[in-house]
């Protein structure tokens, strides 16, 4: 739809320019006619006056002086009074209106078409930059380095395998229970409730991340699970409690 609109605007602008040029030519001709016609009687009158002055005054030197005086006023009167009135009133108005009209058409067409492209570019750039790289780049480095130290120091791998299977099935609540039953309460039964809470939090956080294979393969689950991204700073702040719980487990073993 944009191409026919532009072609129509161009055709209209060309037609308007042709009409305006014709009008300007006609006005110039009319102004020339007005400038030539009314000046002729004035010139004739001045010549008649000069002749009368010549007849009245005697001598050769006398007619030379009135020529200078009488011929000088008609020249500014003929050039200034009729011609500028016609030329200044008609031509500048038409030229200004025509130029402004053509410029307005071109400016309007430029204004209507130009802002559409930068908006599309800006929206595409912002959406692409915000959606794809942030989701992929931020999630992968968080998952890969944190899973390796969690899995290496702990000896028993049986509850983790069960947790990964349950994570694939979709039930998140019993994972924390299996971890608490498997490691937390068996390794430190004499610990206070304060440490047991931290241990439960650490195991529940690990259950959210689960195994690397399941998390990487299930891309829609990463997008649909905001708590994993929200809980990551909490886990970083609980690093001290993790180290203490790991030391206690190592001492008990």
UniProtKB/Swiss-Prot annotation:
One of its GO terms (biological process) is sorocarp development. Residues 1-192, 212-253 are annotated as: Disordered. Residues 1-14, 63-104, 111-154, 236-253 have a biased composition (Low complexity). Residues 215-235 have a biased composition (Polar residues). Coiled coil: none annotated. Residues 17-30, 45-60 have a biased composition (Basic and acidic residues). It comes from the Eukaryota. Signal peptide: none annotated. This is Putative uncharacterized protein DDB_G0284619. The lineage of its organism: Eukaryota, Amoebozoa, Evosea, Eumycetozoa, Dictyostelia.
């Amino acid at each position: 739809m944009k191409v026919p609109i532009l072609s129509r605007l161009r055709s209209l602008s060309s037609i308007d320019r042709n009409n305006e040029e014709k009008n300007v030519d006609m006005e110039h001709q009319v102004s020339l006619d007005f400038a030539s016609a009314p000046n002729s009687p004035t010139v004739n009158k001045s010549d008649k006056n000069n002749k009368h002055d010549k007849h009245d005054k005697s001598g050769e030197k006398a007619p030379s002086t009135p020529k200078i005086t009488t011929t000088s006023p008609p020249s500014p009167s003929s050039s200034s009074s009729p011609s500028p009135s016609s030329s200044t009133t008609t031509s500048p108005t038409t030229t200004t209106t025509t130029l402004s009209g053509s410029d307005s058409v071109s400016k309007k067409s430029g204004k209507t078409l130009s802002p559409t492209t930068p908006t599309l570019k800006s929206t595409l750039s912002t959406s692409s930059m915000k959606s794809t790289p942030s989701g992929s780049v931020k999630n992968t480095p968080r998952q890969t380095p944190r899973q390796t130290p969690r899995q290496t120091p702990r000896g028993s791998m049986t509850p983790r395998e069960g947790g990964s299977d349950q994570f694939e099935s979709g039930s998140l609540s019993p994972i924390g229970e299996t971890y608490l039953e498997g490691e937390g309460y068996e390794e430190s039964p004499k610990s206070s409730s304060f440490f047991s809470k931290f241990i439960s939090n650490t195991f529940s956080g690990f259950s959210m991340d689960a195994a690397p294979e399941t998390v990487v393969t299930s891309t829609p689950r990463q997008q649909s699970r905001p708590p994993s991204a929200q809980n990551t700073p909490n886990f970083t702040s609980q690093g001290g409690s993790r180290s203490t719980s790991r030391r206690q487990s190592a001492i008990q073993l």
